[in-house]
Amino acid sequence: MANQLRHSMAALSLCTAVMFAGPAFAEPNDGVEGLNAEQQAFAGRFLQFQDDMDEKLFGQAGKINGGHSSDVKETTKDQYADFYVRVARGDVVEKIGRMISRVYKPKSDIQRPTTFGRYYGLDVHAKSPLMGHVHSAIVLQYYTDGTGALGGTLNLLKGAAQEEDMKYVKNALDVVFEKHGRDPTPYRNRVCNSAQEDSVQPKYHRKLACVGASFFGFPMMEVNEENFLFMTEIYAAFVSSYLDTLEGRKDAPYTDEDVAKQEAMRLNWLEDQFLGDPYSSGGIAPYDVWGHAFLPPLVKF
């Protein structure tokens, strides 16, 4: 695992180094024309980061699968936002799904008007019940008053995930926290204890391992160089380290009890998305968008 962690951090450094290239997903009426020069630079880097993550994470999953059995992209547009969905499937990484939203105007009172807004969310569903399930998100927004914010969440739904693997993912995040001189405690506490406070119906809230971190629910981070590097690095470290463990565990035997835990986990995630999460249950993104990107490949009732 130590060699894998060094490999992950080396790949992370590469990702950080290349994210200054020209923006991806940039189109007319993209919102960047309403930003000053510094804001445009961060917006462009965030757009490029999205492309970098797609290439890295879908590529890593495809390598584990020995090639995806399918890889589909879809775009959905309405008056509030454009949604870009990509879903790939295979024998080991059963489903990896991504949703990017480009927001034009609020659809709910829990949103603020923006001049630029991007949400990048990615879920990984492993075939093996020993791997749990990853839900991750990172967002950059500039508001009409000229301020900006970074946020995100890094969730591991436990299922039958193994302690050794969860420790590996947790350590990968701790490397980034330490590098940037930040205390992980308040961010980790939100996934360990208090995130249910934001749930529409707390009894359906996702059951998370005390491994990841949440950067929502605080005064969100302002957009500056240090915060941008921290957020993009920790996001990449989380998903990539999970895929490392998935590759190492792909041929491990499992029991009927493990399968039952996976089935319960997937049902819990479905309930969370329909009844607990304010964004999905509140209709901010259409069901056919977030359902395609984030829901498990199979849920049993």
Model-found features: residue ranges?
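Aromatic/basic-lined ligand-recognition segments
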Residues: 80-104, 195-219, 287, 291-299
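N-terminal secretory signal peptides that target proteins for export/translocation
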Residues: 1-4
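Gly/Pro-rich turn-and-neighbor structural signature
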Residues: 27-111, 225-229, 243-251, 258-287
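Compact, glycine/acidic-enriched structural inserts
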Residues: 144-189
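Boundary at the C-terminal end of the N-terminal hydrophobic targeting segment
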Residues: 21-26
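Internal mixed beta-strand/loop scaffold within catalytic domains of large alpha/beta enzymes
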Residues: 78-150
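Hydrophobic helical h-region of N-terminal Sec-dependent signal peptides
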Residues: 10, 14-19
